[in-house]
UniProtKB/Swiss-Prot annotation:
UniProt-recorded name of the protein: Zygote arrest protein 1
Family: Belongs to the ZAR1 family.
Protein localization: Cytoplasm, Cytoplasmic ribonucleoprotein granule; Cytoplasm
Cell inner membrane found in the keyword field: no
GO molecular function, one term: zinc ion binding
Coiled coil regions, renumbered to chain: none
Organism this protein belongs to: Rattus norvegicus (Rat)
Length: 361
């Protein structure tokens, strides 16, 4: 009935029972071999070597997934390790799942490609090959480069505005406040830069037209500059109209990376008319936008503090107190108003609790 094969090198670790005899598995002196199922009469029988490989694979996957001592199905066992989907599997297996040699190198970084790029390809944004998990040491240039790629993808490349700046970087902690406080001068500077760059790019853009005009009319050499000068004001106006929304888009792209800082918040419940000072909240740097909410202890409704101020000393107005005579309740390293809230003292969740969030993307 069964094809001739070599004896199985490893007997089945689980003893055969009468209940399991009719479940599609036949146990004998030469080892275990699966029977063909009734609904698949032409199913090919597994050879001894194939069964041994699948059984070892099943044992390995049982150890990796830390399953119980139950018998593992030896028909097939596989785990999909994909950096786009199964991040949890990668975390359990370790960081060795993503090897540096498996990543494809960009065509610009190859040692043999030393030829200068054509002007058509010079304005293309850098390609991001695939999404790699952030915990892996193999990342595409880090978090800042991913923001650069996202910002460069939105900028047009065929003369529809100013090209992407070469030195794009992530904003410093103080730049978010500056960008939010003074958005108009940056847009005007962007318009001026776009106007200057458009003026520099216009001669090569008009070169094909002028060459075609010179080839069609070899005697007339003066009209092309006149036409170019006539088209300058409209092109400049159009470039201004195009550059202003692009500058706002780039500002929005930069503002996506928001640094957080701790501030002092006064909490107030309007429904219960209860007010208390609960010390530390996380705000976007330079603003009063709060990312941490609390619930009222009476009505349990969510609300935000109606007033947020910097964590500074009341007398010297500094983050680190520099007063000659310090009050007893003020910590020299953390000069907050620590005497206002007395209910959270010696509790697990108190006003002194801080959170590990540093930035929000």
């Amino acid at each position: 009935m069964f094809p001739a094969s070599t004896p199985h090198p490893c007997p089945h670790p689980y003893p055969p029972t009468a209940a399991k005899a009719g479940d599609g598995w036949r146990f004998g002196a030469r080892g275990c071999r699966p029977e063909p199922p009734s609904f698949l009469p032409g199913y090919r029988q597994l050879m001894a070597a194939e069964y041994f490989d699948s059984y070892q694979r099943a044992q390995l996957m049982a150890l990796l997934s830390r399953m119980g001592p139950r018998p593992v199905s030896s028909r097939d066992a596989a785990v999909q390790v994909n950096p786009r989907r199964d991040a949890s599997v990668q975390c359990s297996l370790g960081r060795r799942t993503l090897q540096p040699g498996r990543r494809r190198a960009s065509p610009d970084a190859r040692p043999g490609s030393c030829q200068p790029r054509s002007p058509a390809r010079a304005g293309r944004p850098p390609r991001s090959w695939r999404t790699v998990a952030l915990y892996s040491p193999v990342t595409f240039g880090g978090l800042s480069s991913s923001l650069e790629v996202a910002g460069d993808r939105q900028t047009p490349t065929k003369g529809e505005g100013r090209p992407a700046p070469t030195g794009t970087r992530e904003p410093e902690p103080g730049e978010v406040a500056v960008m939010k406080a003074v958005p108009q001068p940056q847009s005007e500077e962007g318009d001026v830069q776009a106007e200057g760059q458009d003026g520099q790019e216009q001669p090569p853009r008009e070169d094909p037209d002028s060459v075609a005009a010179m080839q069609s009319e070899p005697g007339s050499e003066e009209p092309p500059p006149a036409v170019e000068m006539a088209q300058d004001p409209s092109d400049v106006a159009a470039s201004r109209d195009r550059a202003s929304p692009q500058s706002t888009e780039q500002d929005k792209e930069r503002l996506r990376f928001q640094f957080l800082e701790q501030k002092y918040g006064y909490y107030h419940c309007k429904d219960c008319n209860i007010r208390w000072e609960s010390a530390y909240v996380w705000c976007v740097q330079g603003t009063s936008k709060v990312y941490f909410k609390q619930f009222c202890r009476v009505c349990e409704k969510s609300y935000n503090p109606y007033r947020v101020e910097d964590i500074t000393c009341q007398s010297c107005k500094r983050t680190r107190c520099a007063c000659p005579v310090r009050l007893r309740h003020v910590d020299p390293k953390r000069p907050h108003r620590q005497d206002l809230c007395g209910r959270c003292k010696d509790k697990r969740l108190s006003c002194d609790s801080t959170f590990s969030f540093k930035y929000i993307i």
